[in-house]
Amino acid sequence: VTVKGRTPERSPRIIGTGSPRRQVQIMEHGDVECRLLRGNVDTRLEKLYQGEYDGIILAAAGLNRLGLFNDPRFSFEFLEPEMFIPAGGQGIIAVEAKKGSEVLKILKKLNDKEAERALFAERKVLRLLGAGCTAAVGVYAKEENGTFWMGLMRETKNGLIRRKISGAPEDSM
């Protein structure tokens, strides 16, 4: 998110985020400095508008839910998950129901098997890496045209590692 019509005059550009995973991916793009950004979405946007940051990274789902894409003060650029890898499980909706209930039968019909397979694969990778919520690790899996695809990024002491793999959906687990 940037302020509409504002061109940053400072170098490096200051980008705000609260996520270590996002910070390391932003730093790949050259002339930028990452600064910690805290607060609710309105607070973060106000800090951007007041000039504390040249841009901030926010989840599109949250901006959409809050109706903020219509705010005329801001410009929005969407980062593709294949390139700017999200946290594992991002975007998944989970619903709990009592075992054996009628609700569970309905929910099973609504379940997206491809999304479920992707989630299980992402969670398995996170477990294998021992990645907690503060780790700079991203994993994104999806099925497309009969192929299972996964992208992974992880910060190490030697820098950022990125990997992409693909294969048959039945081999995803």
Report each predicted region and the residues it spans.
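A conserved helix-loop-strand patch within extracytoplasmic ligand-binding domains
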Residues: 1-35
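Small-molecule-sensing regulatory modules
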Residues: 23, 29-173
